[in-house]
């Protein structure tokens, strides 16, 4: 049977940490908890479960903290968990079975990440496979009978174990600070991180967060050539910002840019923004038309709810207006 190190990074998780560790304590062989600056009872709670509790100075970088946690692991595999995750009894048993039968050539195990009913998520599905269990020391294997080469792709196993993400508070302000600090340090956001930033802004960004994002987008546009996909995402956020800031001409400019980029067929998000614009200006028939376009004629690119749930609720609210 393989051995498993649990690695976690935490900060002010006193409300959920025991809930998480109680699920995992009978599965793992080692618990490593890295605290990034808790001011509540997180550290005393963690010390009830393990002596391996480490302090790590927060650097606005989750990867650095996770890498530090991984560096403390000693077991065959590393399981990475967040404090607001739980595993029910059926999936605990599945995890134990996996541990007893895991083949040594498996390097990553993916598990089903369940986000149903969460406080905040940018997933466009309630469940998705995510890598959760990692082989600590990787061996390299030669492949192909001639012109042989070393296999660089990991051997991945997709399990049916379900991990339930059940936060009790919204972390988006923390996330916005991290996105902003990353850009301030590097003047760069990778395409994947940029998209995640735009998704979080669309779901949860208030006027102040959108204004800061608009400044980042403006600065990035001077240094980086946006792909059409990234420019479309940015234009949605700029449109929302200008609508909330009551800057009609700039709002329309951003909205029209979407039509140009998407060759006349806009995305659901900009249809919802146009609907909200007309609704706020008292033109309810025009607003309804754009909600219908969002629901029936277009596809979302940032938030799947903008293509169904949001316009459906709005149309019910407007009724026969």
Locate the predicted segments by residue.
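Short aromatic/hydrophobic "clamp" motif used to bind/position activated sugar donors
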Residues: 78
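A conserved acidic beta->alpha catalytic loop
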Residues: 23, 35-45, 58, 82
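Conserved donor nucleotide-binding strand/loop of the catalytic core
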Residues: 43-68, 72
């Amino acid at each position: 049977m393989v051995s498993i190190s649990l690695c976690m990074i935490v900060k002010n998780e006193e409300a959920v940490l025991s809930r998480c560790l109680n699920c995992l304590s009978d599965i793992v062989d080692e618990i490593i908890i890295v605290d990034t600056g808790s001011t509540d009872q997180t550290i005393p709670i963690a010390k009830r479960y393990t002596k391996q509790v480490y302090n790590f100075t927060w650097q606005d970088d989750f990867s650095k903290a996770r890498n530090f946690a991984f560096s403390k692991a000693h077991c065959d595999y590393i399981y990475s968990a967040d404090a607001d995750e739980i595993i029910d009894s059926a999936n605990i048993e599945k995890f134990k079975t996996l541990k007893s039968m895991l083949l040594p050539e498996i390097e990553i195990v993916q598990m089903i990440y369940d986000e149903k009913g969460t406080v905040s998520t940018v997933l466009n599905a309630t469940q998705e496979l995510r890598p959760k269990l990692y082989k600590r020391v990787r061996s390299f294997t030669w492949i192909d009978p001639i012109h042989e080469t070393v296999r660089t792709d990991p051997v991945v196993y997709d399990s049916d174990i379900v991990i339930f993400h059940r936060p009790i508070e919204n972390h988006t302000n923390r996330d916005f600070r991290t996105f902003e600090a990353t850009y301030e340090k590097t003047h760069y956001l990778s395409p994947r991180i940029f998209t995640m930033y735009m998704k979080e802004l669309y779901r949860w960004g208030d006027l102040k967060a959108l204004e800061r994002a608009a400044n980042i987008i403006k600065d990035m546009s001077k240094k980086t050539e946006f792909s059409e996909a990234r420019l479309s995402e940015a234009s949605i956020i700029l449109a929302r910002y200008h609508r909330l800031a009551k800057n009609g001409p700039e709002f329309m400019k951003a909205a029209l840019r979407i039509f140009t980029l998407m060759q006349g067929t806009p995305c659901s998000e900009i249809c919802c923004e146009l609907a909200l614009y007309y609704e706020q200006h008292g033109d309810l028939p025009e607003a309804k038309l754009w909600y219908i376009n969002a629901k029936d004629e277009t596809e979302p690119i940032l938030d799947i709810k903008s293509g169904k749930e949001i316009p459906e609720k709005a149309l019910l609210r407007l009724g026969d207006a």
